[in-house]
Amino acid sequence: MAIIGLGTDIADIERVDKVFARSGDAFAERILAPSELVIYHSLKLKARYLAKRFAVKEAASKALGTGIACGVSFQDFIVSNDERGKPLLSLSGKAAELAESMGVKHVHLTLADEKRYAVATVILES
């Protein structure tokens, strides 16, 4: 196994909260996949959830080498959790196609948040 891609991103939770205050659910609907939106609508701390998901999706797009461009969208990256709470990242759409063409077999994700910031790192492995 070899590392094919690595991406990291940090998001300012206060900044995301300001965007959320201006645009309401429109920002969430632009970046979240349908399964993530279900969770988002059930939460009180929506900005924190959005900031973490935004950081993950940016980190994943950097690991792919595309950014959010070349047909890759925020909704191509879907965050879920296993039964112990470990974050999992799955790819769909153009992101999945690119990952397959690059030989990606494993996707690793870690994310954290503290007061004002959310950070995520994604590793793509063969």
Curated annotation (Swiss-Prot):
Example GO biological process: fatty acid biosynthetic process
Q: Which cofactor does this sequence's record say it needs?
A: Mg(2+)
The protein's UniProt keywords, in alphabetical order, are:
Cytoplasm, Fatty acid biosynthesis, Fatty acid metabolism, Lipid biosynthesis, Lipid metabolism, Magnesium, Metal-binding, Transferase
InterPro entries hit by this protein: 4-PPantetheinyl_Trfase_dom, 4-PPantetheinyl_Trfase_dom_sf, ACPS, Ppantetheine-prot_Trfase_dom
Please name one Pfam family that this protein belongs to: ACPS
Q: Which residues form the signal peptide?
A: none
Q: What is its main location?
A: cytoplasm
Query: Record's Gene Ontology CC terms?
Result: cytoplasm
User: What's one GO MF term for it?
Assistant: magnesium ion binding
**What chemistry does it catalyse, as a reaction equation?**
apo-[ACP] + CoA = holo-[ACP] + adenosine 3',5'-bisphosphate + H(+)
The EC number of this protein is 2.7.8.7
Annotated Mg(2+) binding sites: 9, 58
Q: Where in the cell is it found?
A: Cytoplasm
Family in the record: Belongs to the P-Pant transferase superfamily. AcpS family.
| NCBIfam families linked | acpS, pantethn_trn
Describe the task this protein carries out. Answer: Transfers the 4'-phosphopantetheine moiety from coenzyme A to a Ser of acyl-carrier-protein.
HAMAP family membership:
AcpS (MF_00101)
What's the protein name? Holo-[acyl-carrier-protein] synthase
Gene name tied to this protein: acpS
